[in-house]
Amino acid sequence: MNNLSFSELCCLFCCPPCPGKIASKLAFLPPDPTYTLMCDESGSRWTLHLSERADWQYSSREKDAIECFMTRTSKGNRIACMFVRCSPNAKYTLLFSHGNAVDLGQMSSFYIGLGSRINCNIFSYDYSGYGASSGKPTEKNLYADIEAAWLALRTRYGIRPENVIIYGQSIGTVPSVDLAARYESAAVILHSPLTSGMRVAFPDTKKTYCFDAFPNIDKISKITSPVLIIHGTEDEVIDFSHGLALFERCQRPVEPLWVEGAGHNDVELYGQYLERLKQFVSQELVNL
């Protein structure tokens, strides 16, 4: 998320904008697309083509594990979706909402590595205005985007809610919390989450104002699924206190992972990240 200048902060106090204005200032940094999707003549099969800016070029076997397609949201945008079959015997599929400055091309290699290590398939999507998705990134579009992804995951692949783990990272925790507050799933994982947009910009904010954006703090108590929160103690973008505050409001919290010394973008580089996910998916969920 962007740091606000002094003049922008003054403007925010004196002339409070609508939530959409806060959202666009704080949250959305879509990169130049790192991939394209090409449709065949039948209109039913899409092929992923990665640019040189993507983090990793795939082997044929790895590319065969990735299926991409487009789906339409309730707001009329077409969003790119990606299903990564990481494990033939996976019980769970992660519905993964990524961070604010990446797209599916950049994240896809991470999905392959993560899914194969925790024995889960991964379904992800690009927000409106990201990657091959049409439209513009807004808070309302975030909610419509994940709703369309959830519907596609359930109808196209026949995956039941009890086999879906809703996973959000950074700004991706916003649509994830919104969806999880409305639909029950196997579990919810919130990675470097924020409480609200105003609380990121103004750390001393104690309540949610009508012009606030991304009010996770007011929605998380509505989640009835188990919630695992992961946060770095030295997060320089979304302070560690956000993770703590959300944890305290959960109906069904599980043991959180506070990664000592980790920042905002390196939590997954610490060994305890994978260890905690493996334990949660393979052991704890069975008994919850």
Swiss-Prot record:
Bilayer topology annotation: Lipid-anchor
Subcellular location: Cell membrane; Recycling endosome membrane; Cell projection, Dendritic spine; Postsynaptic density membrane
Family matches, as InterPro entries: AB_hydrolase_fold, Hydrolase_4
GO BP annotation list: negative regulation of protein localization to microtubule; positive regulation of protein localization to endosome; protein depalmitoylation; regulation of dendritic spine maintenance; regulation of postsynapse organization; regulation of protein localization to synapse
EC numbers for this chain: 3.1.2.22
Top-level EC class as recorded in UniProt: hydrolase
Keywords of this entry: Cell membrane, Cell projection, Endosome, Hydrolase, Lipoprotein, Membrane, Palmitate, Phosphoprotein, Postsynaptic cell membrane, Synapse
Post-translational modification summary for this protein: Palmitoylated on cysteine residues located in a cysteine cluster at the N-terminus which promotes membrane localization. Palmitoylation is required for post-synaptic localization and for depalmitoylating activity towards DLG4/PSD95.
PTM annotation (Phosphoserine): residues: S282
Alphabetized Gene3D superfamilies for the sequence: alpha/beta hydrolase
Gene Ontology CC, one term: endosome membrane
An MF annotation (GO) of this entry: palmitoyl-(protein) hydrolase activity
Documented activity regulation: Inhibited by palmostatin-B.
Active site: residue positions: S170, D235, H264
Top-rank taxon: Eukaryota
Catalytic activity: S-hexadecanoyl-L-cysteinyl-[protein] + H2O = L-cysteinyl-[protein] + hexadecanoate + H(+)
Described function: Hydrolyzes fatty acids from S-acylated cysteine residues in proteins. Has depalmitoylating activity towards DLG4/PSD95. Has depalmitoylating activity towards GAP43. Has depalmitoylating activity towards MAP6. Has depalmitoylating activity towards NRAS.
Record-stated family: Belongs to the AB hydrolase superfamily. ABHD17 family.
Protein name according to UniProt: Alpha/beta hydrolase domain-containing protein 17B
Highest classification ranks of the organism: Eukaryota, Metazoa, Chordata, Craniata, Vertebrata
